[in-house]
Swiss-Prot record:
Organism: Shewanella sp. (strain ANA-3)
Gene: rpoC
Quaternary data: The RNAP catalytic core consists of 2 alpha, 1 beta, 1 beta' and 1 omega subunit. When a sigma factor is associated with the core the holoenzyme is formed, which can initiate transcription.
Protein name: DNA-directed RNA polymerase subunit beta'
Catalytic activity from the UniProt record: RNA(n) + a ribonucleoside 5'-triphosphate = RNA(n+1) + diphosphate
EC numbers: 2.7.7.6
């Protein structure tokens, strides 16, 4: 019967909803929720264990304790359901209602809601325009507030202390009204007339001049408008009625031994009820004011504690000295409702066990212990047993399974056939942390895992555990098989490279197979086929590494898919010929005819996937693995102590270094070098000695001398096991071998500084006690760092996911013509990332032309795949404008064309792909590999930074970027502009190298001149900053008076005198206003002009400039008038690794940021103040001047009279992303963040596609600030979603009104997550109280657009397979709103549609 009822219950339609609104509850609303008033603080009767009447667990209010049974037991059973017992007043119904029925408490005196009082900015304070301090004094009964001044001189809202109040009473009697406590605040709030206030403020806003006042008024206005539009009333921020949570959500559980465990909420409610009842009694008794006041204050405090304990004053503690957990604590934090129960739940049909290796499995299989499978698939087995007639009832089936009858195992085999299971390893850092496999039943208790998927899971077999989940429904199984099967996840979503590459043993085996040995057994034999090679190897006629000639047959696949066979004879080895047997048809033999290291194998798999597709690759990967394991076993590669060969030269090299160190030590003692220099030099000496030793060691290890067939000695790569492991990329590296057989080298202290005495021993020789002790430092620091790093990296990932979670591909093409310009990344003389890698898989935004013509090479909207990239390289294209998510025009999502290729699938991205989450995971997952340290520049690094020339590495021709220059008397070019760059272009017009050159650089070659590799083409003095003349003439000193603005200094060694300008601070009062400068005059004494302008050629001299010329000296173009000594830049710490990435994504301002020019114009310096210079920029068109005060110690890059462009650097330093966005635009800030983040990852050798970083940047840029409102609803200075403004503007333009203008704003990821439109998503991220308070006051509604909100309300997410469900729902909703239009369709059209559908279905294979 009960089941029948449940069934009937399910038939009733659940409520469909499209959004969730949050608001303030009015007292009447709270009463309407309630099923009765709770009047007593009692919980249950401790003798009978029955709930007390009118108490906190009262059955009359909240419902029966047992299903369909009233409290006194008069009515039992189902037939009475719905009856209310006349004896005990309990409704006969399910006990489940105790989870949903609320009660209420009528408060004897109103109480302020602490969230609206204390959550900053205080809403009550803003509303009343009073300070929080004052309101608190009123609420907690320390002072009076005037409510109704009447005809008196008092003002409404004025604070009165006790004495003032008594004085006023004497003076005015009862003409005025003043109160204290929440009643007073309630009255004040009730008296506010929202519409009138809003009107007033809107009128006075334009006339306000002071910035702070304007901000305050805008804030208040926004709050008032929020209240007004949402229909909330301000007085509802004060509670008159308190709702009571349903009792089953705050349970009271009997423990054994007669004690009870209770939720803290019960204690808190009990306090409130006790105080409320006492207050009622006091009011009835008309007790003295002071007692009532005290009781009211206590009531206020107890309600505060219930809502948010510890927000004000000391937290109320329970019996165990711990603060009680209030309602606010229930929902916030990691253990709160959101993160613990809504976003992550524990699920059934899951198990976990240790993993072991399964080298015999296929890629799509995993070994599942029989015991586990039996438990996981129980319901399926019961069903099958019953269906087969082996068991009559479920109970019998249960018994059979418990006894483990033989038939059960047969049934189990059938049940799991083709039923995929999902394996997950924590921490799941990216989507490859959960994959589906077909289970294979095994004996034992450990799960077997295929070795190739270990890289994706980051799993090893040292005791890792993994969880198994069973997809139950058909849809779930389908998804697991079609999307999550390990065979479908061959490429990494982070960079599009294969993620199932062999590693360790497999690599070693394949490498060993493909090596060649001089004069091996069978060298020089000829074979007619690979089969014959196999025979020769099996019979021992030829060994694995013998160099032989073999005739091979290759399959060549043409462009049209035609397969042709070709035969040729190749020089190869026996092993490589054997490898070619597993090579799939269609791949060239050359791919295995080389030493197969890890990189080569990865490339081989990649090529296979791109050329032959998924299926062949999967089979091939498995074959590679089996082969690799087999030959690794045969090779017998193992490590013995004799494999670590210590080079003989080591001891002489170490002795030389020690002698050098002694010499430096002596120089230091005789005072020739400073302590710092000595330290740096010593470290350099040891570092280079270490390099030399390791070089000798590697040469020693990597080659051996053998006698070839002609009896001559010849060198060949060695078969030393350690060397083979490192060379193949299986395990270990040169740096680790150096510690085994070279010297351990320099060690760092825990604080990061380097200890100057290195460890000269290696592990083979063994360490002495001191050396061992020094080594422990590093090892321990490593462990501590790792722990910190994991936490930090996890937090970064969480913030990234949160900011990007709602970004989904929702349309094919937004049609924008914008894009980012991609060029190869060149740093100095190296191409760090070629153009090919940057544009592969992106869509062209603007036609790419053949160089030097107007013909289109790649039209707009082409998806650049491998073939297209080859074409671009062929025609040496070196910049392409590609579509990017940053410039995508789609509202609330992105389009497929702007995103380009789905990296994990290799084709254009599908609709509904959750690119935001994928991007966040791709950036966050390698986070644990990044370092945590900040790099100190010292020693070798600091000297390298003072370069003074450019030496080219490639020949080509010279090209200058944004450079102004003059030609000096020697015919050489002198650069007279700031951020100039010099590039080397090869004969095809591709940029090969790029260097920054400072002001005053002398170029040895003219522009466009040919240069040879190794030429030095530019020189400058790194220690001084010259001032260079652009005209020739004689010089005139102005305002240069000896002893006032300058002094003469004579160099002791040379006897030359030079003039040094005094700093303003050092001059006497006479020289303060003087501006020393050099004017250039012609032969007739007239002022010369700078060529092409009307500006007289005069050069101001800043403080401490050195002039080596005399008055009236002749000077030529390009000569230095003066030199300004550069203080060697202070050693800046470079933040590296994880902290740097976090800083970039949080868009934090650096400590001393670069100062950029706000407008274009001419520089001049105004009046100086004590510590600052006044920089003035005058625009050329005579607009408004821009002034900025800059601290004196900042090194300026500009001189008086110089022209700057907007966004140019005025003072050096790390650039702030906000400034770049403001002054140089979106494209520049995107490039800056992408390149900076990539630099950090590149240093660790991690590849991440630029797209992912762009996705995050798009989310950081999703807000804008309204600069002028036009005819829109927005307020000036308001922060709004860009897509909102765009939509509003489209409507306004359609109606012919003035659209709003806005400036994009860059928010850090935490700020951006909290500023999202969905309050549910923001609340579940951080600062829950603040977010919810703000949302409630604004009456916000959440349209459940993102992924997180939908997970929280328990729906399918609007991404992936859930995307279609949401799309149909939204279309249905739109249809409901639209007038019905009947769609007519002809038969031929229907036929065509069907054909298209079938074609589509066929193309998905």
């Amino acid at each position: 019967m009960k089941d029948l009822l449940k069934f009937l219950k399910q038939q009733s339609k659940t409520e469909e909803f499209n959004g969730i609104k949050i608001g303030l509850a009015s007292p009447d609303l709270i009463r309407s929720w309630s099923f009765g008033e709770v009047k007593k603080p009692e919980t249950i009767n401790y003798r009978t264990f029955k709930p007390e009447r009118e108490g906190l667990f009262c059955a009359r209010i909240f419902g029966p304790v047992k299903d369909y049974e009233c409290l006194c037991g008069k009515y039992k059973r189902l037939k009475h359901r719905g009856v209310i017992c006349e004896k005990c007043g309990v409704e006969v119904t399910q006990t489940k209602v105790r989870r949903e029925r609320m009660g209420h408490i009528e408060l004897a005196s109103p109480v302020a809601h602490i969230w609206f009082l204390k959550s900053l900015p205080s809403r009550i304070g803003l509303m009343l325009d009073m300070t929080l301090r004052d309101i608190e004094r009123v609420l907690y009964f320390e002072s009076f507030v005037v409510i109704e001044p009447g005809m008196t001189s008092l003002e409404r809202g004025q604070m009165l202390t006790e004495e003032n109040y008594l004085d006023a009473l004497e003076e005015y009697g009862d003409e005025f009204e003043a109160k204290m406590g929440a009643e007073a605040v309630l009255e004040l709030l009730r008296a506010i007339d929202l519409e009138k206030e809003i009107e007033q403020m809107r009128e006075e806003l334009p006339s306000i001049n002071s910035e702070t006042r304007r901000k305050k008024v805008t804030k208040r206005l926004k709050l008032m408008e929020a209240f007004h539009t949402s229909g909330n009333k301000p007085e509802w921020m004060i509670l008159k009625v308190l709702p009571v949570l349903p009792p089953d959500l705050r349970p009271l559980v009997p423990l054994d031994g007669g004690r009870f465990a209770t939720s803290d909420l019960n204690d808190l409610y009990r306090r409130v009820i006790n105080r409320n009842n006492r207050l009622k009694r006091l009011l009835d008794l008309a007790a003295p004011d002071i007692i009532v006041r005290n009781e009211k204050r206590m009531l206020q405090e107890s309600v505060d504690a219930l809502l948010d304990n510890g927000r004000r004053g000391r937290a109320i503690t329970g019996s165990n000295k711990r603060p009680l957990k209030s309602l606010a604590d229930m929902i916030k934090g990691k253990q709160g409702r959101f993160r613990q129960n809504l976003l992550g739940k524990r699920v059934d049909y899951s198990g976990r066990s240790v993993i072991t290796v399964g080298p015999t499995l296929r890629l799509h299989q995993c070994g599942l212990p029989k015991k586990m499978a039996l438990e996981l698939f129980k319901p399926f087995i019961y069903g099958k047993l019953e269906g087969r007639g082996l068991a009559t009832t479920i109970k019998a089936a249960k018994k059979m399974v418990e006894r483990e009858v033989a038939e059960v195992w047969d049934v189990l085999d059938e049940v799991i056939r083709e039923h995929p299971v999902m394996l997950n390893r924590a921490p799941t850092l990216h989507r490859l942390g959960i994959q589906a496999f077909e289970p294979v039943l095994i004996e034992g208790k450990a799960i077997q895992l295929h070795p190739l998927v270990c890289a994706a899971y980051n799993a090893d077999f040292d005791g890792d555990q993994m969880a198994v989940h069973v997809p139950l429904t058909l849809e779930a199984q389908l998804e697991a098989r079609a999307l999550m099967m390990s065979t479908n996840n061959i490429l990494s979503p982070a960079n599009g490279e294969p993620v199932i590459t062999p590693s360790q043993d497999v690599v070693l085996g394949l490498y060993y197979t493909s090596r060649e040995r001089i004069n091996g057994r069978g060298e020089g034999m000829y074979f007619m086929s690979v089969a014959e090679v196999e025979k020769a190897y099996a019979t021992g006629a030829a060994e694995l590494h013998a160099r032989v000639k073999v005739r091979i047959t290759e399959t060549v696949i043409g462009d049209n898919g035609e397969r042709t066979e070709q035969r040729r004879i190749v020089d190869t080895t026996v092993g490589r010929a054997l490898l070619s047997q597993i090579l799939p048809a269609g791949l060239s033999f050359d791919l295995v005819n080389q030493n197969m290291g890890k990189k080569q194998i990865s490339k081989l798999l990649n090529t296979c996937y791109r050329q032959l597709g998924l299926k062949d690759t999967v089979i091939f990967a498995d074959q590679l693995m089996y082969t690799g394991f087999r030959y690794a076993t045969i090779s017998g590669a193992s490590v013995g102590i004799d494999d670590m060969v210590i080079p003989a030269e080591k001891y002489t090299l170490v002795a030389d270094a020690e002698a050098e160190v002694l010499e430096i030590q002596e120089q230091f003692q005789s005072g020739l070098v400073t302590a710092g220099e000595r330290y740096n030099k010593v470290i350099d000496i040891w570092a280079s000695a270490n390099e030399k030793v390791s070089k000798a060691m590697m040469e020693n290890l990597s080659t051996e001398t053998v006698i070839n067939r002609d009896g001559v000695e010849e060198k060949q790569a060695s078969f030393n096991s350690i060397y083979m492991m490192a060379d193949s990329g299986a395990r270990g590296s040169a740096a680790q071998i150096r510690q085994l057989a070279g010297m351990r080298g320099l060690m760092a202290k825990p604080d990061g500084s380097i200890i100057e005495t290195p460890i000269v021993a290696n592990f083979r020789e063994g360490l002495n006690v001191l050396q061992y002790f020094i080594s422990t430092h590093g090892a321990r620091k490593g462990l501590a760092d790792t722990a910190l790093k994991t936490a930090n990296s996890g937090y970064l990932t969480r913030r990234l996911v949160d900011v990007a979670q709602d970004l989904v591909v929702i349309e094919d093409d937004c049609g924008t013509h914008e894009g980012l310009t991609m060029k190869p990344l060149i740093e100095g003389g190296d191409v760090v990332e070629p153009l090919r890698e940057r544009v592969l898989g992106r869509v062209v935004a603007v036609d790419v032309l053949y160089p030097g013509t107007e013909d289109v090479l790649a039209p707009r909207n082409t998806l650049l795949d491998e073939a297209w990239c080859d074409k671009l390289e062929e025609h040496s294209i070196d910049e392409v404008i590609v579509r990017s998510v940053i410039t995508c025009d789609t509202d609330f999502g992105v389009c497929a064309a702007c995103y380009g290729r789905d990296l994990a699938r290799g084709h254009l991205i599908n609709h509904g792909e959750a690119i935001g989450v994928v991007a966040a995971q791709s950036i966050g997952e390698p986070g644990t590999q990044l370092t945590m340290r900040t790099f100190h520049i010292g020693g070798a690094a600091s000297r390298a930074s003072a370069e003074n020339n450019v030496q080219v590495k490639n020949s080509g021709s010279l090209k200058l970027h944004n450079a102004k220059y003059v030609t000096n008397t020697d015919g050489k070019l002198v650069i007279v502009s700031r951020s100039s760059e010099l590039a080397i272009i090869d004969e095809l017009g591709r940029e090969k190298e790029r260097y920054k050159v400072p002001y005053g650089t002398v170029l040895e070659k003219l522009e466009e001149a040919a240069v040879e590799a190794g030429d030095i083409i530019a020189n400058w003095d790194p220690h001084t900053h010259p001032i260079i003349t652009e005209v020739a003439g004689s010089i005139k000193f102005v305002d240069m008076i000896d002893g006032v603005t300058m002094t003469r200094q004579t160099d002791e060694l040379t006897g030359l005198s030079s003039i040094v300008i005094l700093d303003v601070g050092q001059r006497g009062s006479a020289g303060k206003e003087m501006r020393p400068m050099i004017r250039l005059v012609g032969a007739d004494g007239s002022d010369l002009m700078i060529p092409g302008t009307e500006v007289p050629a005069q050069y101001f001299l800043p403080g401490s400039a050195i002039v080596n010329l005399d008055d009236n000296a002749q000077i030529a173009v390009g000569d230095a008038l003066a030199r300004i000594p550069q203080e060697s830049s202070k050693t800046r710490d470079i933040t590296g690794g994880l902290p740097r990435v976090a800083d970039l994504f949080e868009a934090r301002k650096p400590k001393e940021p670069a100062i950029l020019a706000e407008i274009s114009g001419t520089i001049s310096f105004g009046k100086e103040t004590k510590g600052k210079r006044r920089l003035v920029i005058t625009p050329a068109d005579g607009g408004e001047q821009y002034e900025e005060m800059i601290p004196k110690w900042r090194n300026l890059n500009v001189f008086e009279g110089e022209k700057v462009e907007r966004g140019e650097v005025i003072a050096d330093g790390p650039e702030a992303a906000h400034d770049i966005l403001r002054l140089r635009g979106i494209h520049n800030v995107a490039n800056y963040i992408v390149n900076e983040v990539q630099d950090v990852y590149r240093l660790q050798g991690v590849k991440i596609n630029d797209k992912h970083i762009e996705v995050i940047i798009r989310q950081m840029l999703r807000k804008c600030v309204i600069t002028s409102a036009g005819d829109s609803e927005f307020l000036e200075g308001e922060q709004v979603e860009v897509s909102r403004v765009k939509i509003a503007n489209r409507d306004l333009i359609e109606q012919g009104k003035v659209p709003a203008t806005f400036e994009r704003e860059l928010l850090g990821i935490t700020k951006a997550s909290l500023a999202t439109e969905s309050f549910i998503s923001a609340a579940s991220f951080q600062e829950t109280t603040r977010v919810l308070t703000e949302a409630a006051v604004g009456g916000k509604s959440d349209n459940l657009r993102g992924l997180k909100e939908n997970v929280i309300v328990g729906r399918l997410i609007p991404a992936g397979t859930g995307y279609a469900y949401h799309k149909t729902r939204n279309d249905a909703r739109a249809k409901k709103d639209e007038p019905v239009v009947v769609n007519k369709i002809t038969a031929s059209e229907a036929e065509q549609n069907l054909a298209d559908l079938l074609n589509l279905a066929g193309s998905q294979d």
